[in-house]
Amino acid sequence: MDFLTDWLTNWLKELLIGGIMGNLEGLFDTVNTQVGEIAAQVGTTPAAWNAGVFSLIRQLSETVILPIAGLVLTFVATYELIQMLLEKNNMHEFDVANIYKWVFKTACAILILSNTFDIVMAVFDVSQSVIADAAGLIQGSTDITPDMLAELETTLEGMDLGPLLGLWLQSSVIGLTMQIMGIIIFVLVYGRMIEIYLMTSLAPLPVATLSNRELGGTGQNYLKSLFAVGFQGMLILVCVAIYAVLIQGIATGGDPIGAIWGTVGYTVLLCFMLFKTGGIAQRIFGAH
């Protein structure tokens, strides 16, 4: 009878250990997958992310918004010319050089405005190039291999049936947590790209104000926001890389309970920090 009880206990322990290791291995595989997916998403340019959406945004920007921006630029240039003429004693002291300077400045503004879409895309090409270079380094240093879990499995083999059952239930809950985290990351990464498209569609309007000292703050702040959104992808990638390294430390710690609940804590921390990356990027570039 004792033999049967021991056999049943050992069989249940093996079953639970296999279930726990399966959950944890799947959990850590999810970490690697998330790092790869985020690196691919935030490292993609707006043109490559979705060709159909990109074409739509370009048409809206160049056919609907650009003519309105042309009117804005006309107002800005006229306002600046009048202001320049009135500065010299109500046109009594007229300097022809100022007219040449105004013509040159207006011509540059028209050239920039007519190429606004390409300039905006160049900003994102630069940021995506930096992100793509960083993604290769980050992915190579955060991969979690199966041999890291060998020590953890040895610890589980020395535990009783009751604690193993509790750990199995907890590890199953963590799997659900990781799926929720995946949804949050999906919303944040895709939301960032949609924000990029929205900012790009209206780009000519703030760019039209850049040539004026008084009104140029609108255009300058837009460019700062543009760089902030572009390099937000870098901050997202850094957050996930830090998370993966912390998870790697859990996997090699040999403490099953700590591994499970540490993963919960780090997952919540990751989601919290991902939502703060936009604000951090804006503070770095001085956008508001």
Describe each PLM feature range.
Residues 187-191, 220-229:
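Hydrophobic alpha-helical bundle architecture
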Residues 165-215, 234, 238-245:
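Hydrophobic alpha-helical transmembrane segments of integral membrane proteins
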Residues 102-105:
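Elongated alpha-helical scaffolds
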Residues 1-72, 88-97, 107-177, 216-221, ...:
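Gly/Ser-rich, low-complexity
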Residues 67, 71, 75, 79, ...:
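Hydrophobic alpha-helical transmembrane segments in multi-pass membrane proteins
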Residues 81-94, 182-186, 214-215:
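Membrane-water interface regions at transmembrane-helix termini and the short interhelical loops
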